[in-house]
């Protein structure tokens, strides 16, 4: 009986040792798994942070780029509005010249524009008080001295003209209205106007 008890004891001892070895091994493996998982978690966290920073940087760059484009667009719109206003003011100044200065300007313009001095002149209703028959007499006298016909006369034709005039012959029409002349010269003048307005 003692022999059996001894065998049982040995079996229990062996089982206990085996159990302890298994537990130790399991603990060690668990610790290794946990350490590996912790390292992976740290790595993943670092990668996620790196990605998040990259995404954030990209998003920031995108937002700033859009904001810069919008700012530039607004600046160009404001710049264009100021240039437009400068041309509108220039036209208004021409339209609102004192009658004598206005007549003098139109006088010089007709002399420069007349081809043979045998044209009709179309003017706005508002300008009929400034561009008078007396003015055309002066113009015709000056044209005759230049060797031209000296026969500029009022046309019965009506056009929507704000200021200036149109000279018309049987074959040609010369537009000397202020808005047209400003429009024609705008491309050339716009750069200069912009330089004056926005000189840096």
Curated annotation (Swiss-Prot):
GO BP annotation list: proton motive force-driven plasma membrane ATP synthesis
Keyword list, A-Z: ATP synthesis, Hydrogen ion transport, Ion transport, Transport
Gene Ontology MF terms in the entry: ATP binding; proton-transporting ATP synthase activity, rotational mechanism; proton-transporting ATPase activity, rotational mechanism
InterPro entries named in the record: ATPase_E_C (IPR038495), ATPase_V1_Esu (IPR002842)
Gene Ontology cellular component terms for the protein in this record: proton-transporting two-sector ATPase complex, catalytic domain
Stated family: Belongs to the V-ATPase E subunit family.
Protein role: Produces ATP from ADP in the presence of a proton gradient across the membrane.
Protein name: V-type proton ATPase subunit E
One Pfam family hit: vATP-synt_E
């Amino acid at each position: 009986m003692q022999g059996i008890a001894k065998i049982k004891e040995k079996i229990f001892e062996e089982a206990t040792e085996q159990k302890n070895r298994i537990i130790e091994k399991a603990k060690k493996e668990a610790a290794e798994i946990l350490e590996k998982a912790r390292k992976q978690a740290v790595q993943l966290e670092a990668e996620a942070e790196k990605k998040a920073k990259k995404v954030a940087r990209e998003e920031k760059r995108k937002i700033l780029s859009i904001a810069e484009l919008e700012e530039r667009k607004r600046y160009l719109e404001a710049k264009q509005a100021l240039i437009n206003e400068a041309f509108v003011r220039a036209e208004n100044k021409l339209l609102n010249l004192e009658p004598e200065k206005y007549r003098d300007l139109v006088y010089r313009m007709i002399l420069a524009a007349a081809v043979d001095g045998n044209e009709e002149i179309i003017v706005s209703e508002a300008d009929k008080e400034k561009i008078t028959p007396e003015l055309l007499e002066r113009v015709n006298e000056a044209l005759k001295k230049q060797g031209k016909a000296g026969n500029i006369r009022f046309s019965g034709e009506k056009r929507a003209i704000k200021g200036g005039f149109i000279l018309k012959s049987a074959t040609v029409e010369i537009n000397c209205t202020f808005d047209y002349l400003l429009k024609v010269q705008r491309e050339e003048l716009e750069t200069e106007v912009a330089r004056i307005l926005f000189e840096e």
